């Protein structure tokens, strides 16, 4: 199984808009000074995906060449629930996952990021096992060894969501890794909301040590950069601009400098849009 190597240089960007065409997300990334981006490859709030055309693929490839952006990440749709207890929703999710991954391969995207799932009326244990099956069923798409990694995003621990603890993510990875290339996208707001104190370099040291012991740092492939409106451990997923929330700017400076995290692709999801992202990218590059 081919495993995409990590980038050789630090990459920083944001979740940009694909309005008017997927390629436009790449051009917006260039305009804000990014070296990578995240985007939705389809409407994130609908089950039905439009089919990629050869023209769409060619436009995207041209934009990749013209912008020199790399390690592009697709964020899968919000309706997906890989661990859904409802058979109908589970089947819809698996179809959508398959289409999402196939499109990412066609476009030459490096990462596809999924929320691991929600147990809803069922146990988290059963949800975790269904999610493992869902992701493992994507194996046929990887028989040609495409340079794509499926990422499981850390969650804030709200409701019945799985993936808020490193232990749950480790369980998922152990069940999936023999079938498809898999890793973790660490969302700073989410892990802070889930109780991991990353508001200081000392806190990060403990969290990274714990991550390495439970999952392994080799599985940490990308980071969502978001400050948090709410204090530590509140299980609330509310993003704030960098340095304007309860995590604080010191935490993000650490990520930009520490050798374990410096070169990991990082994607801003902060509220404020392109003008804010331009300022945040400049700031983070300055402190790196």
Curated annotation (Swiss-Prot):
Residues that hold Zn(2+) 2 according to the record: 153, 187, 224, 269
Entry keyword set: DNA damage, DNA repair, Endonuclease, Hydrolase, Metal-binding, Nuclease, Zinc
InterPro entries linked to this entry: AP_endonuc_2, AP_endonuc_F2_Zn_BS, Xyl_isomerase-like_sf, Xyl_isomerase-like_TIM-brl
SS bond list: none
Entry keyword annotation includes Nucleotide-binding: no
Cofactor(s) in the UniProt record: Zn(2+)
Binding site for Zn(2+) 1: 75, 115, 153
Catalytic activity: Endonucleolytic cleavage to 5'-phosphooligonucleotide end-products
Pfam (any one): AP_endonuc_2
EC number per UniProt: 3.1.21.2
Gene Ontology biological-process annotations: base-excision repair
Domain of life: Bacteria
Residues involved in Zn(2+) 3 binding: 190, 237, 239
Single GO term (MF): DNA-(apurinic or apyrimidinic site) endonuclease activity
PROSITE patterns listed in its UniProt record: AP_NUCLEASE_F2_1 (PS00729), AP_NUCLEASE_F2_2 (PS00730), AP_NUCLEASE_F2_3 (PS00731), AP_NUCLEASE_F2_4 (PS51432)
Cofactor note: Binds 3 Zn(2+) ions.
Biological role: Endonuclease IV plays a role in DNA repair. It cleaves phosphodiester bonds at apurinic or apyrimidinic (AP) sites, generating a 3'-hydroxyl group and a 5'-terminal sugar phosphate.
Assigned protein family: Belongs to the AP endonuclease 2 family.
Protein's name according to its UniProt entry: Probable endonuclease 4
């Amino acid at each position: 199984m081919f495993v995409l190597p990590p980038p050789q240089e630090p990459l920083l960007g944001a979740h940009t808009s694909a309005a008017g065409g997927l390629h436009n997300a790449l051009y917006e990334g260039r305009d804000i000074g990014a070296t990578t981006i995240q985007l939705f490859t389809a409407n994130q709030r609908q089950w039905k995906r439009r089919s990629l055309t050869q023209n769409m693929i060619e436009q995207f490839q041209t934009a990749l060449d013209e912008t020199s952006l790399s390690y592009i990440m697709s964020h899968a749709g919000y309706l997906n629930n890989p661990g859904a207890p409802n058979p109908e929703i589970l089947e819809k999710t698996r179809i959508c996952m398959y289409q999402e991954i196939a499109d990412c391969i066609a476009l030459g995207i490096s990462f596809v990021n999924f929320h691991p799932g929600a147990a809803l009326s069922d146990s988290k244990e059963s949800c975790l096992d269904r999610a493992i099956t869902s992701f493992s069923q994507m194996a046929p798409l990887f028989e040609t060894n495409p340079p794509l990694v499926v990422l499981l995003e850390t969650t804030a621990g709200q409701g019945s969501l799985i993936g808020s603890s490193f232990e749950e993510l480790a369980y998922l990875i152990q069940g999936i890794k023999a079938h498809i290339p898999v890793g973790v996208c660490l969302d700073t707001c989410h892990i802070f909301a889930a109780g991991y104190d990353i508001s200081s370099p000392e806190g990060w040291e403990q969290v990274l040590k714990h991550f390495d012991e439970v999952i392994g740092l080799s599985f940490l492939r990308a980071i969502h950069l978001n400050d948090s409106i709410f204090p530590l451990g509140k299980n609330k997923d509310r993003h704030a601009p960098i340095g304007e929330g309860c995590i604080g700017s010191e935490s993000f400076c650490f990520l930009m400098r520490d050798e374990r995290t410096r070169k990991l692709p990082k994607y801003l999801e902060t509220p404020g849009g392109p003008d804010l992202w331009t300022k945040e990218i400049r700031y983070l590059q300055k402190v790196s």
